[in-house]
Amino acid sequence: MKLYYKVGACSLAPHIILSEAGLPYELEAVDLKAKKTADGGDYFAVNPRGAVPALEVKPGTVITQNAAILQYIGDHSDVAAFKPAYGSIERARLQEALGFCSDLHAAFSGLFAPNLSEEARAGVIANINRRLGQLEAMLSDKNAYWLGDDFTQPDAYASVIIGWGVGQKLDLSAYPKALKLRERVLARPNVQKAFKEEGLN
């Protein structure tokens, strides 16, 4: 598998899951402004929407959208928690959490819009806080991770997004469970491996 990524972007989530799954993978960086791959290729030829991530599973076959990519990687791994049985409540909960991560991701996206006025930024942050409050309510102090005691794909995705808030110096003190989740995720050796591969601390 080849993952097309941008350093620190949402593509870090599937990078983490590839690392955790122990599957062989290649990485190719993308210049999202120029829409060029690291080897100078036209990224629109890989993903017509021009966004990361994109996962090439074999020559000519590419999956886009994080939720789909994360589930695909899980289903092709040997990690039981990454691929609950079809039709099970556990699988539905995993997909529910991935869907919420997409909502949380969308809330944060506005933070990176160019020329954002103070009023617009305040509105974006209010929406982020609303979504983070929802996430906080979903998390349990009794569990090590979001869906229980096993690390799963939503943990990776949510942690990447929460990290954007940390990087933007947002006040996240109202979300201790979310911050603790991120802390646990960042402590995992395979997560640290993915960060190192992207040149992140």
From Swiss-Prot:
It comes from the Bacteria. Residues 87-201 form the GST C-terminal domain. Belongs to the GST superfamily. Beta family. It holds the Pfam family GST_C. Its EC number is 2.5.1.18. Residues 1-81 form the GST N-terminal domain. This is Glutathione S-transferase. Gene3D superfamilies: 1.20.1050.10, Glutaredoxin (3.40.30.10). Conjugation of reduced glutathione to a wide number of exogenous and endogenous hydrophobic electrophiles. Changing residue 10 to A: Strongly reduced affinity for glutathione. Reduces enzyme activity by about 50%. InterPro entries: Glutathione-S-Trfase_C-like, Glutathione-S-Trfase_C_sf, Glutathione_S-Trfase, Glutathione_S-Trfase_N, GST_C, Thioredoxin-like_sf. Homodimer. The gene is gst. Keywords: Cytoplasm, Transferase. It catalyses: RX + glutathione = an S-substituted glutathione + a halide anion + H(+). It is found in: Cytoplasm. Glutathione binds at residues 10, 35, 52, 65-66, 102-105. One of its GO terms (molecular function) is glutathione transferase activity. The lineage of its organism: Bacteria, Pseudomonadati, Pseudomonadota, Alphaproteobacteria, Hyphomicrobiales.
